[in-house]
Amino acid sequence: MRLLLILLLAMISPFAQSMTLLNQTPVLEVLDGRLHGSLLLPKSDRPLPVALLIAGSGPTDRNGNNPMGHNDSLKRLAQGLAKQGIASLRYDKRGVGESLALAPDERDLSVEAYVADAAAWIEKLQGDPRFSSVILIGHSEGALIASLAAARQPVAALITLAGSGRPIDDVLREQLQGRLPPALLASSHYLIDELRAGRTHQPVPEALKVLFRPSVQPYLISLFRQDPAQAFAQADAPALIIQGTHDMQVGIEDARALQRSRPDAELALISGMNHVLRIVPAQPQQQLASYNEPDRPIARALTERIMKFLDSHGITPASS
């Protein structure tokens, strides 16, 4: 019995050691202030790959949470990667969470600033001897930021999660169609046209201020200038497009549009996965509930597919 116990301990010991994780809170100095992040680092004697996780639109923090939902999607992804021996850094964007002081007024936000911040994080990670390579993983609007940053600062791999394949103004028009009365729909199309042309507009109908309030218009102008598929095509790194089949915000056709822009990219459709990376039925009520269920596990197939992709490109954990 004693010998059996010793053998069992010997078998699980390397596994237990590989699961030792360090949590750190790095700070990145940029020209106008500081960005704050969370580094999840499997303990290792050798350099290991690190993934930079880039959150989606609006006031979404490093963990994937915003005022509309607390689901810890990116925190859960970081934990899943760590179990496979992949380090990760996720960060609060300027104007969000601990990085609020960088842009307390949303008028100061722009896609260009987000991309510069991501590129600066990449450079910091690439200069850290603890890491062998940098992987970019962008979720939702973060997929666009990741694509643009990858073209600016070369990385070992680019992964998009639920990223749009069309200009965001086109997506917005589609989402508003059928949801607004004719007069408001016409006003929204006019506002989108103005912003697409680079012009702010006041006044804004009260019912549309949540989308087109004057303070967010400068950011929308910078966003509407972007073409996600074109940005993705210009990134040279090996690329993986991941899309859930039960995502109610971004459709499979968006993923296919990204792949059409770059046929060498891999496409992985995760059956039943929604926008916050959970396996959830397509019914709206259950979908909405999952946006506030931080304890619900993320899709197992998600981390499995990421690891398969990384392994195929020689990006392996230190324990491999």
What name fits each language-model region?
Residues 123-178:
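Primarily recognizes the serine-hydrolase "nucleophile elbow" in alpha/beta-hydrolase
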